[in-house]
Amino acid sequence: ILFSPILLATALALKLAGNGSIFFRQKRATINGNVFEIIKFRTMYEDDPQRQADSLSAREGDDRITPIGRFLRKYRIDELPQLINVLRGEMSLVGPRPEMLENVEKYTREVPEFRYRQRMKAGLTGLAQIEGKYNTSPKDKAILDLLYIENFTLSYDFKLLLRTFTIFFRRDSTEGFGDKQCDCPQMRMEA
């Protein structure tokens, strides 16, 4: 109910812009490798399905992103339809990022610990979603997900939920890691 006005206004703006469907749907991986269809507001032109699938290379200034899409990404509004995934039980509010299926195998080869992300249900928000941005490397996002999993507590989830709201008001909320340190817990190294 709280986000209804934002959801409705965004859907209307996307429909009036006429750049294709309102929603972007894609298969993603979650707990135990289960697959679900994530729902997001469309931020890219719908002209070429292959280009749409290549969202990893989408960066600031990418010509595939619509003008409305730039605004939605800047303030992370494109992520709000994932609340539907949460209500369906496919995602949790807080957890590791829901990864594209084609990237799970690739990232597991590059970062073997990546497979541990599937120990928890994917989340709408989490450490990687807050500290990592659209242009943060997959390896760094995986490390942030692992830090979250290793330090999971309900109080930590609550803290991350509160921090999520602050990204809507930060200008750098989508710019990736900079020179600043991550406000992250330390990873416990086990022998």
PLM features: residue spans?
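A hydrophobic, helix-centered structural microdomain
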Residues: 1-47, 85, 154, 159-191
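Gly/Ser/Thr-rich helix-start
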Residues: 19-21, 34, 70, 90, ...
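Short, glycine-rich, amphipathic interfacial segments at transmembrane boundaries or analogous
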Residues: 24-64, 124-143
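A short, structured surface patch at a secondary-structure boundary
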Residues: 58-121, 160-168
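Short, hydrophobic secondary-structure boundary micro-motifs
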Residues: 10, 24-25, 53, 94-96, ...
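Short beta-strand/loop motif that positions the catalytic acidic residue
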Residues: 146
